[in-house]
Amino acid sequence: MNSGDSSLIDAVIYNHTLCDGWTNSTEGAIYHLGNTILFLGYMGGSGAYGALYIFSFLAPAFLCLALWGWLTMCGLDVFIWNLLLMLQCLAQVCHLIFRLMRDGLANEEFSALYTAVYLPLDVPVQVFKEITGAGENKVLSLAAEETYAVEGKTPIDQLSFLLSGRIRVSLEGQFLHYIFPHQFLDSPEWESLRPAEEGNFQVTLTAETDCRYISWRRRRLYLLLSKDRYIARLFSVMLGSDIADKLYSLNDKLFAKSGVRLDIRLPSLYHVLAPSPPGSEGGSASSPPRGSLGDPTVIKVDPAPSNPGSGTRNPQPDQGKNPVPKNPHQHWSSDTEMPSGEDSTSLILEDFADMTGSLMDYGHEREYLK
């Protein structure tokens, strides 16, 4: 450290006039009012509205301090600095108000929704305003364990989009999957009905935590989609992606112990997931034949040869000359007539006997999270 720096430090620390004594008098009311408003201003939160709150309080606070410096302290420097700070706060307030009016977003939740979902899709702000306006720019709430829809009772008359929280989806008390933020609550129900049709929910939706969501009435949203093709295509893409995510969330729960994942679209899994008809032992006595058109979830499979040595690579000599055509309408008379002597349901259940993580294994969502 050179001598110049040391002399400056000594001048700051030692070469100054000490206070002879503390005065018992206090500053005027304007000074204390300014500091009180300043204290309240720094209690604002984050985000655009939090900044608007802070600068709206700081501007009158610095105005009071500027008046205090002009009237009480009679100090030009005190007055000028506080006046400059007040002008800067007013400029920030004007900028924030202009930005909020330009964006046209009703609250902070809509702003976060636009930034997270619609901005990556290059959706203009004006289009987003039309979409939220169709839902009356309202954000609805669900308390924990409050029911959004009950299976077989709640009509399908709206479409909702989750902003925060978590929704539990169940069927007859059996947990299916969760709905997370930025997902539709009832996209499958929306796509299952035509505009003129009516129906009820087939699943129960319950709030796992405190939730916030926006909702559109069915008729009003259909009117918007019929008028604007861009919004209609946007909703078509978002709904299709949401339904695919829900299907994959169910599909991810089906996996075997060996690590091989099973596809929920496999026809053979229908017997595992679907309840057996009452009064039937294996679920096959009252089921239609495998080749019938009434069961689209079951496909016809040719039986495996009983002799492992007689495969397609070793045909009989006479079969090469006079091949016997197969009847395309041939099917098993019932599920009990299988080559192995077992009914189809028992065969499928044995195939998936070691399966863990299926839909039938989770009695509660806490087990699903383990």
From Swiss-Prot:
TM ranges: 51-71, 78-98
Localization, UniProt: Membrane; Cell membrane, Sarcolemma
Keyword Cell membrane: yes
Region (Disordered): 275-349
GO biological process entries: cardiac conduction; heart development; heart looping; regulation of membrane potential; skeletal muscle tissue development; striated muscle cell differentiation
Pfam families, per the entry: POPDC1-3
Membrane disposition: Multi-pass membrane protein
GO molecular-function term, one example from the UniProt record: cAMP binding
Residue stretches of biased makeup (Low complexity): 283-294
Disruption phenotype: Morpholino knockdown of the protein affects skeletal muscle development, resulting in abnormal facial and trunk muscle formation with defective aligment of muscle fibers and establishment of myotendinous junctions. A severe defect is observed in craniofacial muscle development, where many muscles are malformed or reduced in size. In the heart, pericardial edema is prevalent in the morphants with defective looping and misshaped chambers.
GO CC annotations on file: sarcolemma
Tissues of expression: Expressed in the heart and, slightly, in skeletal muscle.
Domain of life: Eukaryota
Family named by the database record: Belongs to the popeye family.
Role this protein plays: Important for striated muscle differentiation and cardiac morphogenesis. Is also required for cardiac conduction system development, plays a regulatory function in heart rate dynamics mediated, at least in part, through cAMP-binding.
Listed name of the protein: Popeye domain-containing 2
Gene: popdc2
